[in-house]
Amino acid sequence: MNPAKHNGPYFVGIDIGGTNVKVGIVDDNGKSLAFCKTKTEVDKGVDAGLKNIYQAITDVLSDCQFTMDDIKAIGIATPGTMDIPGGKLVDPPNLPTWKGFPIRQTVCDHYSGKKTIYQNDANAAAYGEYWIGGAREARSLVLWTLGTGVGCGIIIDEMIIEGRHSHGGECGHMIIQMTNGRLCDSGQYGTLEAYSGGKSLVRHCQELLDAGRSSLLHSMIEGGKELSPLLISQAAEQEDELAIELIMESAMCLGVGTTTLMHTIDPDMILFGGAVTFGGRDSELGQRFLQRIREEARQRAFKVPYENTIIDFAELGSDAGYI
């Protein structure tokens, strides 16, 4: 792709998650021109992650026959906790080796002062949906981002809710189980993320397998496959009882969280995106997952907000964060 043949300006978007990093080039209409996914490699520290990110940026620039001179600005999104005005991560549960890291200034300096903007990953994804995705006609939106953890972006009257201390929308850490709740990576017990985050889902699944629960997952793991949300999804598609139980429990908990936000915010739409949506709208399992969320919300929510709030999958899928 030659930049002379396309209308600029162009932007680099970087969506850093606890497992993967997504990097893309986007034009000012939100069209993705190139995309690359790489590993965060959290256990190896921030330098390893940055090396992968810089290489991914080089790759997408090459795909478009661009140089950094063709790029107007860089956008970076990470999971919380964070200091958005200060441009740094604070103490993110799913990026523990990035604690206190000044990501915005580091990337800006690496690219010779290129304008660099920093935002919470769920907020960025919510704005992507609001800008060019499934919430284009909405004035208020909640977007759940389901991945290694559970993020949440909130837009009310066209404004992203960042909060006074950059912690607005950390709804994955709402407490949904007061007694004997599961431990979350945040150090709290009974959070929504402890039940519906991908990392927690895998951990609880392993505990049940170790306790002797029957499942196809035993043979799948013994065959050399790594236990992951994807593997649990594959087992569920074969009607594995344990896998379906775990996914439906995750959906039930998300239904509880969705009800809470419905009563708190009363938004036009509540959408679900990210890598742990079990195939999303294109999958029968994904549709069962969504229907369980809706049913839990129907049972718990006031009638008027439930009947007038759209609950669906995000249109942009896992691309929303870097867009």
Language-model features, listed with the residues they occupy:
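Short hydrophobic alpha-helix segments
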Residues: 36-38, 93, 164
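A charged helix-plus-loop insertion that forms the helical arch/lid used to bind
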Residues: 87-99
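Short loop/edge segments at beta-strand edges and connector loops
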Residues: 118-120, 126
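Glycine-rich phosphate-binding loop of actin/hexokinase-like ATP-binding domains
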Residues: 136-196
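ATP-binding/phosphotransfer module of carbohydrate and carboxylate kinases, centering on a glycine-rich
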Residues: 1-73, 84-86, 107-115, 131-138, ...
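Short beta-strand segments
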Residues: 15, 75-79, 143-149, 153-155, ...
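Hydrophobic "anchor" residues
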Residues: 31-32, 89, 160-161
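A cytosolic small-molecule/anion-sensing beta-strand core signal
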Residues: 27, 72, 78, 120, ...
